[in-house]
């Protein structure tokens, strides 16, 4: 699928690293190091603006290697870029470790995944259909 993109400051375009990759890594569009102290949250720009077709979204997701090795995640867990958003994509980075982490210019800090979405049309009813599970949740099926 073609998605229109504007690169800012010669930012490298994201690309799929393997034929089976679902996500494309995005890079920090910063001119100098950004140090994240433990527990710190900062918005890191990635230097891309996109025009996503209606009926789709792009999810911004943490990179598993950064999370495992350095405790770097995203404060909002997963970010959604809506099809009508035209601003620069940013990553809401959070340092969940007990050590400072330095984000370098051009470092791969998150990944983008394109998803098809549908909008909900609510149908108000008096009762919902029954299931074996019912309202059981929050640990209902095990630990």
Protein language model features and the residues they cover:
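DUTPase catalytic domain/fold
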Residues: 1-143
């Amino acid at each position: 699928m073609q998605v229109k993109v504007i690169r800012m400051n010669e930012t490298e375009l994201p690309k799929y690293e393997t034929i089976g990759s679902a996500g494309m890594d995005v890079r920090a569009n910063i001119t100098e190091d950004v140090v994240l102290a433990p527990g710190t949250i900062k918005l890191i720009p990635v230097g891309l603006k996109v025009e996503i077709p209606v009926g789709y979204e792009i999810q911004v997701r943490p990179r598993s290697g950064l999370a495992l090795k350095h405790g770097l995640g995203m404060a909002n867990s997963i970010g959604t870029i809506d099809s009508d958003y035209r601003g620069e994509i940013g990553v809401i980075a959070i340092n969940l470790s007990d050590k400072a982490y330095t984000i370098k210019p051009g470092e791969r800090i998150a990944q983008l995944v394109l998803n098809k979405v549908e909008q909900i049309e609510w149908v108000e009813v008096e009762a919902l259909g029954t299931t074996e599970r019912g309202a059981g949740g929050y640990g209902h099926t095990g630990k």
